[in-house]
Amino acid sequence: GSSVVGAYQINSGLDVFVDGTGWGTGSWGSGTWGSTTSLTDSNQLRLWSMDNFGEDLISNPRGGSIYYWDNSDGLTTRSVALTALSGANLAPTKGLQVIVSDVDRHVLILGADPINAAGSARTGSIDPLLIAFSDQENAAEWEPRSTNTAGSLRCSAGSEIIGGIRARQETLIWTDTALYS
């Protein structure tokens, strides 16, 4: 016989949201045994966002790395980190959601990690209100220059971006307190 060994590249994460305030909370336990604690712990389920960039695919697990799959490499080739693309320049390393604008084909990363003060690298820490966008028609170029359309915007209201969606000739992005178009 033969054997097969499988190994995942990215943990699939939880399939449910888990929120708790201690072991044995609820009706289980008596007295202080099984009572709740003032400390809470939450484990977010794994939410993926994916969008087409032409015939290619850009994907992002919420709060994780951004990946790019090139259709011309074939179905047996896996996605690579956006930062590993040929010619990648200051591409975000993390984000909350990815969207491709349908009108002008910018890749948008909602909740991206910002470029550092020196302008030489990404910080690696998510700014929950930052929207970073690539150069038009170029998913690898993220450095804002006078010769391209890459850049970023920070939402002025709210504490985090909740989500975004393409609508008719616009992209809607909402935070916990505002809606942007």
Predicted regions, residues:
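Beta-propeller and closely related beta-pinwheel folds
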Residues: 29-43, 75-181
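Hydrophobic or amphipathic alpha-helical targeting/insertion segments
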Residues: 55-80
